[in-house]
């Protein structure tokens, strides 16, 4: 990511950037590198506790200029467009990055502390504009048809937006989740050590 000059597009099912990751995203923003991240929403993840680690950083990611998208199980089921990029449950599984429209990373590594320090992960970088173009096409379809776009409102609160045809729907709570799941994650979050998520 440090070598990016114009754009970076990342998919990661589990995203916990930590302070160093936030610094890297902020540096991209300061260099006017367009950064897009697609990850799982709370409704889509199979690890709600890991999602608490990610949710700590959403505001900072948005403030640093990241275009942030979260996969929606309901929107995915309706469009049936995630295909090999995810699962039939409307969950992101791909771990990819495209830098400047030609360098592609595909691997098993999430952007989280476990992948960095505890798990054995691997990945490959390929310089292929054709592969990058196809991967970007799939990501663009996914983010437009199968994901919520996140933003901050005028008071700095999170909003999730979905576009269906000509209609924009705005959610102020994590979409497709119950009050109880959100409460559980909010209460347990302060006690979860980030390096174990």
Predicted regions and their residues:
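PLD/PLD-like phosphodiesterase catalytic module centered on the HKD motif
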Residues: 15-197
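Secondary-structure "cap/kink" motif recognition
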Residues: 1-7, 193
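Short catalytic-loop micro-motif centered on adjacent basic/acidic residues
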Residues: 9-12
